Curated annotation (Swiss-Prot):
The lineage of its organism: Eukaryota, Metazoa, Ecdysozoa, Arthropoda, Chelicerata. It holds the Pfam family Toxin_22. The presence of a 'disulfide through disulfide knot' structurally defines this protein as a knottin. Expressed by the venom gland. Belongs to the neurotoxin 14 (magi-1) family. 02 (HWTX-XVIc) subfamily. Its main location: secreted. Disulfide bonds join C1-C19, C8-C24, C18-C38. One of its GO terms (molecular function) is toxin activity. This is Hainantoxin F5-22.36.
Amino acid sequence: CNGRDVPCDPDPAKNRRCCSGLECLKPYLHGTWYQDYCYYVEK
């Protein structure tokens, strides 16, 4: 799985999902073209 701050893809077929506890999100303040990254999300 992909660790924190590593590029990811929400498409499961690409097998670039984030590790447990991380979510695949677009960086804040970037355009929609921008790569998704794994971020730690407080529950």
